[in-house]
């Protein structure tokens, strides 16, 4: 999830795309909420370590409060289940960051 090979270009391109998804989530929530439709997004942090250089994994873990990268197939499930469950009935227009706390220090 963290690798950028799917999104070629400079970091500004990545940031603009990310901001676009956040803005679209909020805009669609405002538009569709009156119809009872909730719109939220999940913003995953670094997931791996499959095929990632060990130095990258170690550096990422050192910069993350939870001390590790996200586990593929495990750490996004809770966020998805929450947003799909009645527990999120009063949540819309939100981007749920699942990054082990990485973004709080950035």
Residue ranges and their predicted role:
Residues 1-2, 46-48, 52, 101-103:
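Conserved sequence/active-site signature of Rossmann-fold short-chain dehydrogenase/reductase
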Residues 1-20, 25-34, 46:
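Catalytic loop of short-chain dehydrogenase/reductase
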Residues 75-76, 83:
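Non-catalytic, hydrophobic alpha-helical segments
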Residues 33, 38, 91-93:
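Short, small/polar-rich loop/turn modules that mediate ligand/substrate recognition or access, typified
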Residues 38-48, 84, 97-99:
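Conserved SDR Rossmann-fold cofactor-binding beta-strand/turn motif
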Residues 81, 92-106:
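Short C-terminal tail/terminal secondary-structure segment
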Residues 55-74:
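Catalytic Tyr-x(3-8)-Lys segment
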């Amino acid at each position: 999830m963290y690798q950028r090979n799917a999104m070629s270009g400079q970091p500004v391109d990545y940031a603009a795309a990310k901001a676009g998804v956040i803005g679209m989530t909020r805009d669609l929530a405002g538009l569709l909420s009156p119809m009872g439709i909730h719109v939220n997004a999940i913003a995953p942090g670094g997931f791996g370590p499959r095929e990632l250089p060990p130095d990258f994994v170690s550096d990422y873990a050192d910069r993350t409060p939870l001390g590790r990268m996200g586990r593929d197939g495990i750490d996004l499930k809770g966020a998805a289940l929450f947003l799909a469950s009645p527990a999120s009935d009063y949540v819309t227009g939100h981007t749920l960051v699942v990054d082990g706390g990485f973004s709080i220090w950035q």
